[in-house]
Amino acid sequence: MNYQKRREQVLDKMEKGSIAILYSGVEVHVSADEYARFEANRNFFYLTGLRREEMALVLDKAAEPAKVTLFIEKADPDMERWYGRKVTVEEAKEISGITDVQFMENLPGAINMKMVREDVEAVYFDTYRHAMSDLPDYNVVKAGEFAAAYPGVCVKNLFPLAASLRMWKDADEVAVVKEAIGVTKTALEFVMKNLKPGMKEYQAQADFEYMIRRNGAEWPAFPTIAGSGINATMLHYDTNTDTCEDGKLILLDLGARVNGYNADITRTYPVGGKYTDRQKAVYNIVLAANRRVAKEAKPGMTCAQLNDICKEVLAKGLMELGLIEKKEDVTKYYMHGVSHHLGIDVHDVTVASQAKLCPGAIITDEPGLYIDEWEIGIRIEDDLLITQDGAEVLSEAIIRTPEEIEAFMAGN
């Protein structure tokens, strides 16, 4: 990964005479002596390749020429005995490509000296907060502390500068996403081989998560969804405690994370190895929408336009089944979007002003139908790479037709 190039691109987007301060974050306390698994700020990882707590990146465009400094946590031998080694200065230099690496204890003084001695016009922090989050974000907190300490300095948001770069993947990023998809494929095939009536949803989940870890994934990309029967109609069901019954379907929405990048795949399998005629009829409508979106995706399109195309196909199929009378009623059975960007985040970052797809974008293709009265929930999700004149289905090798799935589950 060319982290240096990314930092240079962000510096180019920053205002003249500004600096950016980006923190990796801190561990979140859960209870007693328990901490949540640490997740580094995604933009920090994107610009450094590092995913450890208590680090900071400073991009200094007020200097001439511009400077880049990385601050890392100093090792404590006693704490390392309990929790493992910290990243060394040499390791941080090698991973990030940054030559000026200092310890975090020097950061406050370095910032203060910069603000006192030089004419800094603006300071960037990553002040983005997801609308669904009510937890304090560490970078937002640090931005507030800075604003209180230096009230005359303009605080700006770094997030859109990094997000505008993250929307388009380079060849190295595409290769890692392909690797994550390959691991996901292997694990899904293991799930299919073991799937049978009477097993618990969490056993299908366990088969998947065991196999991705065995094949080099760091973690699941997100909490695995393994919903059988009526549970397949619940979009983000992840309790995964019910019994898989013969004659029912199981919807598996899952993915592997490899080197910080994610796959996001959904397949819907017959628990007993065979789809019923009704299930197959609904499945083929969803499959037709999936294939149509993959065919239509290209530079210049938007995810909203792809969703309109998806809804047209789904509505036509539902009317043929007699479930709806007019196409506008498709939202009774399909209530989400067909595509989102994919990368370091599963629902990867976007910038509203850059809604049109360009070569290098990786998006999902995930039509679905959720029919409560039939206890049928079907979603088929693939990952697409937007190319110069169309889209490449990165997950094409993960089988999806009813005939392929039935044959595989029968051992053929």
Segments from the language model and where they lie:
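Active-site neighborhoods and metal-handling regions in enzymes and metal-associated proteins
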Residues: 1-412
